[in-house]
Amino acid sequence: MITVRLKIGDGEIVDTQTFGFIYLDSDKRVGAESKGFESTAYPEEEGEHILPKAADDAFDYKIKFFIQATSLKDANQLITEFNESLHDTPDELGLKTYHQVTFYNDYKRHKIVGYPNEIPEATDFWRDHRNQVEDIVIIEWTIRVTKPSLCDFNLGAE
């Protein structure tokens, strides 16, 4: 089984199986894309003026997991518990402060640092090639990477 680990806020680095999530797949990216050049064009001039400098752009990193559960209710309970671990208790206005997460993909040798989106509730079980319902729910989780320089797409062995 492929090992992927997660650190939420200042917590410990744990295997995602701690949450009942088994890694399936993730983005195929090998780095952040660059932002486009800043440019200015004037009607009375040919072409445009550019500033030939560009920084890395923010991006969404998507990860697929499966959850082995006997019912949708059990799978959604695991999702709810995970989602609640991603943020502090809502304040008096109902605002949640999300923790920064660090996702370590030991298979692809990636370290992704960003802010998590909550995983939506599962609605159906996965079906096999014979259209038989299996006790597996497939979920997709997105991490919003706001500062790509914190990520490492060539992580050394630890």
List the model feature ranges, each with a label.
Residues 1-158:
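Extracellular/virion structural assembly segments
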